[in-house]
């Protein structure tokens, strides 16, 4: 490096001049705009890179937990109890279990609570428009009465519900299944 004032180009600076500090020159690179369409191969590469990062993070978490457990041993898990009963005691317990009657569970269902019907809309939200294929709700629902069909043309689409005795709820006030149906009601 040459000193500025001496005119000496031999490469050896004179004693009177201070050495020049290094200068870093930054040149901006032209900006490249990435393409708006993602490249098919690049998406696969990015996904693979993310999966590898996730794998490395999970590996790091597991190893960190193993190291923490090794450095700070916690309380041991309780071991299962060891039975030291004799063979005769075990046989007696099995006999007692067999002698006991099986448990019978009766399911009693409460009636469904009925909410009072007030001015409720049939459509879930008032700000949504009614679909074009449905007419808007017009007050109370209409009930149409039709004459009963003749017995010869009557076809049951749905079988009748089972009698209460079939569901295991036979009691003093519930008749058995044979009394529940009469021969005329069956097809």
Curated annotation (Swiss-Prot):
<dbReference type="InterPro" id="IPR038915">
    <property type="entry name" value="PRR29-like"/>
</dbReference>
<dbReference type="Pfam" id="PF15248">
    <property type="entry name" value="DUF4587"/>
</dbReference>
<protein>
    <recommendedName>
        <fullName>Proline-rich protein 29</fullName>
    </recommendedName>
</protein>
<dbReference type="InterPro" id="IPR027904">
    <property type="entry name" value="DUF4587"/>
</dbReference>
<feature type="region of interest" description="Disordered">
    <location>
        <begin position="133"/>
        <end position="187"/>
    </location>
</feature>
